[in-house]
Amino acid sequence: KVGDIVSAETHIICGECEFCLRGEGHICENTKIIGVDTDGCFAEYVKIPAMNCFVNSKDANPLHLSVQEPLGNAVHTMGHFPIEGKDVVVVGCGPIGLMGVNVAKAYKAKK
């Protein structure tokens, strides 16, 4: 509702393909990514499906909330591979790369 501070899942699934119908929307064959397949969020307003929005506590610090999406990218990427005990290379030290270094450590990468 108006005034809520929300975070959004940036992968918009179709809800109609075989994967979505089986409850496996994470592999939806028709996924649209905000900022890639649709306009991004560097705007005063953005339209996002309600099912992709999560209401945050009014007490939450917006600075902390601002890292949810890039941190999610780092976690998703590192969690996609069996990196425990292995050497990991992160190319690029922007926000996601820097978070990826720490996520790799949390996943027990060798170095």
Task: Show where each model-derived region lies.
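A structural motif shared across PLP-dependent enzymes of the aminotransferase-like
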Residues: 18-19, 37-49
